[in-house]
A protein has these predicted regions:
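Aromatic-lined glycan-binding groove of carbohydrate-active enzymes
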Residues: 1-30, 56, 63
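Terminal-tail/helix-coil boundary detector
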Residues: 25-55, 59, 74-78, 82-83, ...
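Active-site lining segments that contact anionic ligands and/or coordinate catalytic metals
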Residues: 64, 85-87
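Glycine/threonine-rich phosphate-binding loop and adjacent beta-strand/alpha-helix elements that clamp
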Residues: 67
Length: 152
């Protein structure tokens, strides 16, 4: 299993705080998919949920980005430890971002009250969140075997 878009379209970067259309970046009208991104993410519930997380992030001196990446590593359904083959796809625009993201991915589990805030935030945004998967999820083969079958 792989997590794509762990920063919720960049909302966990902390740069976007409201549904006001930015002048630059993926959410702007200058970007060819800006409108699609805004349709997916620019909802009142999304920004309300982010504010819940920001409060606990400040309390623990954590960045929103760090919270997102550490949650993926330690609190999601991913199996990354002890030989697990799951992962997180991260996008970066500089070597410094890559190094910072990798350091955050290597840090330990989040404090309990951060997890509680994330759970609360999910309950706030869940009713208006767009589902990524658009079709029925039906496999006609053993996915584990197809992906991880030992080579002869």
């Amino acid at each position: 299993m792989v997590i794509y878009n762990p920063l919720a379209g960049g909302l966990f970067s902390g740069k976007i705080k409201s549904s006001e259309i930015p002048q630059e970046g993926r959410y702007s009208d200058q970007h060819h998919i800006g409108g699609l991104y805004r349709t997916r993410y620019f909802k009142d519930a999304t920004f309300d949920a982010l504010r819940v997380i920001e409060l606990v992030a400040q309390k623990h001196n954590l960045t929103m980005l760090e919270i997102a990446l550490r949650w993926c590593t330690h609190h999601s359904a991913l199996k990354m430890q002890n030989g697990g083959r799951d992962g997180v796809i991260i996008g970066v625009s500089s070597l410094a971002q890559l190094e910072s993201n990798l350091k955050d991915l290597e840090k330990g589990p989040l404090p309990d009250d951060v997890i509680k805030a994330l759970d609360e935030a999910w309950l706030i945004t869940k009713p208006t969140t767009t589902n990524y998967w658009q079709l029925d999820l039906k496999y006609t083969y053993d996915t584990q075997r197809a992906l991880f079958k030992p080579k002869s």
